[in-house]
Amino acid sequence: LFDSEIMWYKVTPHLGRGVKYQSYDKEIEIPSILYRELKNWERTFMLKESKLRRSMDNYYHLSGNNPKIDNVRVLIDNNYVFSLFKGIEQSKINLSTGEDTTIDFEKETIHIHEPFTPGEFATIIERHTTEIERYILKILDTAQYNAADIDSVFITGGSSLVIPVREILYRIFGKDKIRTGNTFNSVAYGLSLSY
């Protein structure tokens, strides 16, 4: 979910989102529908033979052969979307240190080196972190518990490293109650125990 937001706000402008093309006497922005599809890497393999992909050839010519439009064509035609998302994921991991990072991706004619700050990330995912906080408070209310009644909270998975997520948990439960361990493997281990 967070990776999809990073893709939309930080990466798709390198792939032509926002580029305009000439239509008679008007400049029109390329429709964003293809870029919305890119937010879901697991479905992007279907784009290669799609009408959306073919439309990018037209937009490429109408935009004066804009190289950003060519980037999205290269990305889709060579099934590079998953690799791009790995770069996005790495930038998210880097941000968990609280330091600035870059989203780096190099394939053929695509050269993306997009600066990315923790503050930008917090803004991009704010609507999701607001929902996370709302759900936590709702669960506590439904269970008729106060945060003070909880002895410890065990967090795991990649999102548990995201600073805005941790800040919510610290604010609700207190930093001293938050426990973690084997962040990337404990979810899979727990699932394996259920079989």
Where does each model-flagged region fall?
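Conserved, well-folded catalytic cores of nucleic-acid-processing
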Residues: 9-17, 91-94, 139-143, 172-175, ...
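Phosphate/ATP-binding catalytic cores across multiple sugar-kinase/actin-like superfamilies
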Residues: 87, 91-94, 124-150, 194
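Conserved phosphate-binding/catalytic loops in two-lobed NTP-binding clefts
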Residues: 148, 166-192
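Glycine-rich phosphate-binding loops at beta-strand->alpha-helix junctions
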Residues: 76, 80-81, 148-169
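Short glycine-rich phosphate-binding loop at a beta-alpha junction
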Residues: 19-27, 140-157
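Phosphate-binding glycine-rich/basic clefts of nucleotide- and phosphate-handling proteins
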Residues: 1-105
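Adenine-nucleotide phosphate-binding core of ATP-dependent small-molecule kinases
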Residues: 73-81, 110-139
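Residue-level signature of catalytic and energy-coupling elements of molecular machines
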Residues: 6, 88, 136, 155, ...
